Regions:
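A juxtamembrane structural motif centered on a specific transmembrane helix
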Residues: 8, 169-178
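Aromatic-anchored segments of alpha-helical transmembrane domains
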Residues: 37-42, 136-146
Length: 178
């Protein structure tokens, strides 16, 4: 993942040594992308912290249903104590399902927003930037799906965490490069 990211950043830097000439629409999409990816990273951390990663072991359904029983109030109780949730926690299955489903929904929102940004970048002739972002998004989607299909193997789970880092870093470079 690190080598892929280095190549993408180098390609971006080689493409333009001067500031990118993004129109206002692209700048707004970059800002929106930063917000939705940040929220999704938080949701991923919440999913992991509350042992909800394997609450839905099938795709595209969860427990064989489109909307299985889910307890969003318990799942998103941010005032819960830390100690009792160690090593499996005390949350109900329905609370964990709610957390997992929210992370899945977040992934759909992130994908739609990033695809809008990628399409706008292509229209703006920023082909390498769009291609790099497309590849990073595809990698992250693949790792997320693999986590569900293969029941959360450590290497894929860590790769998924790094993929989130790559996405947010890529977007930050786009946003803050002058």
């Amino acid at each position: 993942l690190g080598d892929v990211y280095k190549r993408q950043v180098k390609d971006i830097e080689d493409q333009n040594r001067t500031p990118w000439n993004f129109n206002l629409n692209i700048k707004r999409l970059i800002n929106l992308s930063l917000v939705v990816v940040s929220i999704q990273i938080f949701l991923g951390a919440w999913t992991s912290t509350n042992y909800a990663s394997i609450s839905c072991a099938d795709l595209p359904l969860c427990r064989g249903q489109l909307l299985p029983p889910a307890d969003f109030i318990s799942g998103f109780n941010f005032l819960q104590t830390i100690g009792p949730n160690y090593l499996g926690g005390l949350l109900s299955d329905e609370a964990r399902v709610a957390i997992h489903l929210t992370h899945r929904l977040g992934s759909i929102v992130v994908t739609l927003v990033l695809l809008s940004l990628i399409f706008s970048l292509y229209k703006n002739q920023s082909l390498k930037v769009a291609g790099g972002l497309s590849g990073t998004l595809a990698l992250q989607i693949g790792l997320g799906i693999s986590n569900v299909i293969f029941s959360l193997p450590l290497l894929i789970a860590v790769g998924h965490n790094l993929g989130g880092l790559l996405l947010i870093t890529y977007l930050a470079v786009l946003r803050f490069r002058e």
